[in-house]
Amino acid sequence: MTQENIGKKMLSESKFFMGYSRWDEDNNRYETWNESVNRVMNMHRKKYKDKMSPELEELISFAEKMYAEKQSLGAQRALQFGGDQLLNHEMRTYNCTSTYADRPRFFQESMYMLLCGAGVGFSVQKHHVAKLPKIHKRYEKKVKVFTVPDSIEGWADSFGVLLSSYFVEDATFPEYRGCQVHFDFSKIRPKGALISGGFKAPGPDGLRSALTKCEELIEKRLKESEQNEVNLRPIDCYDFVMFMADAVLSGGVRRSATICMFSKDDDEMLKAKTGNWFIDNPQRGRSNNSVMLQRDELTREEWKNIMKSVKDFGEPGFIFTDNLDFAFNP
């Protein structure tokens, strides 16, 4: 084997053991390549067991042979999460997703996607955010406790519960409407504990911090208004997702990947990463931001204003589109 090939082999194997090989508790070691391939292919057999036939088994066995010999490469997400972990959360198969901040479930759905390890592209364009229900002040003496389940659904639902306590309608957890919510994190495994797939638990601190910051964000918006009911602004929705993303250590492997799309006349979003944002709003470092520009509807002055921000701060990016309802992934 040449020195060049030795280097490639070392790089390949180090990446495999760093990000894809599972810890084998029974044998007190990491999986070999062939064991990982076997885990992935057995997952496919389990998923489609009701549709198996001798012909299909023959094809799967041939694919497995090519996979094991590295003549072909399957989905890396299947290699990373393959087995019951992926069968229980099939969104783990996807690298990236995209959606709109136009409904109450958007927030917990985005958190769920991030916890599955998928990147999230999301639009906080004004015509999307306008579809969200208003938020209102909560009753001081009305208190409910939410015990956060030790699961990615539980983590995601905790943000749904928090927002449900503020939304005036269409809450995903209506029983918490108007309540002061106390979060109980006692069910969450401590930092470093092993979780499914041989990964390590991040502990509750990141989640606790994110929920606190999201609550402070909403309370600040309510205090700024003399009205009992107010609308969330695009910058609020953006920061809410950024706080969630800051709490995610997906699968014990990587942080979140996000891209935020916003309206061209949204000055707050245009300036989201200006000045001392990295000190005052470090959570915004979890996203790339892009202004949505509909073709043939952009003036020279609007373009100059956007380019000034890009020149001074490196962001936002810009996306020319035929339709403002098109969305993009990170």
Can you say where each PLM-predicted feature lies in the sequence?
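Extended catalytic cores of very large enzyme megasubunits
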Residues: M1-P330
